């Protein structure tokens, strides 16, 4: 069974993937899968990671996953859980048996975005303040009838849902 859990920045994807890994489950944060993702300019050319959110937005850069790479990665597991998101996430849906959207309370997201433990805090802010990447994903999930997961649940509670 191949399961995708996607959602906007600071919804808890990294935390959940790590918690499940600690339980011995094949769970991965998409950002930690070497070779899965990269940044691209508007012409589709791979670029170095932007220094901050303003650079990415101003230059119309996109953070995308490689479908070919993901297909190969998923083939290595009979059961696997991928937590993540990208600008082309909907193009990956057909690779998964189940798909969930991780919905977090906006206030909790803001607090998480301000955490000193964020991997790349410069990407979480722009000239207007805090930046939530992928907030458009909720609308996509609603339109596609994807099941929502409450991010305030424990990793064990969420695993109980996604492992069925």
Language model: regions and residue ranges:
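Conserved substrate/cofactor phosphate-moiety recognition/catalytic segment
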Residues: 18-67
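ATP-binding Walker
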Residues: 11
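Walker A/P-loop
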Residues: 14
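Short, well-ordered alpha-helix to beta-strand connector turns
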Residues: 24, 77, 96-97, 144-145
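Small-molecule kinase domains that catalyze NTP-dependent phosphoryl transfer to phosphate-bearing small molecules
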Residues: 89, 118-161
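Conserved phosphate-donor/acceptor-positioning beta-strand/loop module used by diverse small-molecule
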Residues: 94-116
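Glycine-rich phosphate-binding loop used to anchor ATP phosphates in small-molecule kinases
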Residues: 56-96, 103
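Hydrophobic anchor at the beta1->P-loop junction of P-loop NTPases
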Residues: 5
């Amino acid at each position: 069974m191949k399961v995708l859990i996607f959602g906007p920045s600071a919804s808890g994807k990294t935390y959940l993937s790590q918690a499940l890994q600690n339980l011995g489950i094949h769970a991965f944060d998409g950002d930690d899968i070497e070779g899965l993702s990269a940044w691209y300019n508007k012409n589709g050319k791979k670029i170095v990671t932007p220094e901050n959110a303003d650079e990415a937005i101003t230059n119309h850069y996109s953070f995308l996953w490689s479908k070919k790479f993901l297909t190969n990665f998923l083939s290595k597991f009979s059961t696997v859980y991928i937590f993540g998101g990208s600008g082309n996430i909907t193009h990956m849906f057909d690779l998964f048996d189940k798909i969930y959207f991780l919905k977090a309370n906006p206030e909790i997201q803001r607090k998480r975005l301000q955490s000193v433990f964020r991997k790349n805090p410069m990407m979480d802010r722009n000239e207007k303040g805090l930046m939530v990447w992928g907030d458009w994903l909720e609308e996509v999930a609603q339109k596609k009838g994807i099941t929502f997961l409450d991010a305030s649940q424990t990793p064990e509670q969420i695993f109980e849902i996604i492992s069925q």
